[in-house]
Amino acid sequence: TPGNDSAAAYLARRYASFGLKATSPGFIQKFVARPPAHSGQSISLPSQNVVAMLPGRDPALRNEYVVIGAHFDHLGTSTEGALDPDARGAVRLGADDNASGSAAVVELARIFSHSPARRSIIFANFSGEEEGLLGSAYFVDHMPVATDSVVAMLNFDMVGRMKNDRVIVYGVATATEFPSVLERANAATQLKIAGQGDGFGPSDQSSFYAKNIPVLHFFTDLHDDYHRASDTPDKI
């Protein structure tokens, strides 16, 4: 859609402004989305992921990669998947689902661009998540690096509505190092982390875990505005 194209172009401009490396022309990884057919007739839609890379600072580790990702699509004016289907014509902005996660990835890219990590980082914004993880499914089959060089994937989906300093983190059992990594990372902020072991779930980290890549999915829980036109920026 024009909105999807505009969002992708914005993300690409931000990554370019940080001086990140493009892994495909203009940071855009094009693919053809084939959402599940509900009427018995399959459709094909051109779409895109937005992908950028930041080389690591440690020569011994820069050939290992961490993917930091989030989906940037939402429902828009479609009532398919909406929990307020009677609100026809309403624009479902998806401020929490998932502009919040997209913003988190962009902000992490900005921070790391000034202070690179030891390992290389791939920043990836996926389209087609709401239609069945289509963008991330394509990405894991067409990564700019070898699959076995990706040591972890961090997914941010719906991270803008935290209550009582509580964050749910899925996938903590997918790597033995994750519990201690989270503990160290949380030392300063002292958030209440509700860890869940399983790496599978209804978001893009599942595409990576299916490839045996350790994953973490950060999530601040569901709310009454989920998949409704009331998921607006003023509530973030």
Can you annotate each of these PLM segments?
Residues P2-N4, R62-Y65, T77-L83, L133-A137, ...:
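Short, solvent-exposed loop/turn and secondary-structure capping segments
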Residues A52, L61, I68-H74, S78-L133:
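Alpha-helical metal-binding/catalytic segments enriched in His/Glu/Asp
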Residues F126-H223, D234-K235:
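Metal-dependent peptidase/peptidase-like ectodomains
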Residues A12-T23, P36, P55, E107-A117, ...:
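Sec-exported extracytoplasmic/periplasmic mature domains
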Residues T1-P55:
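A non-catalytic alpha/beta surface segment that caps or lines the substrate-entry region
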Residues P2-S17, G26, S100-E107, I111, ...:
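Extracytoplasmic/secreted proteins, especially bacterial periplasmic and envelope-associated proteins
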Residues R110, H114, D224-I236:
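His/Asp/Glu-rich mid-to-C-terminal helical/loop segments that flank catalytic regions of hydrolases
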Residues Y15, K21-A22, P35-H38, R57-P59, ...:
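Solvent-exposed loop/turn segments at secondary-structure junctions
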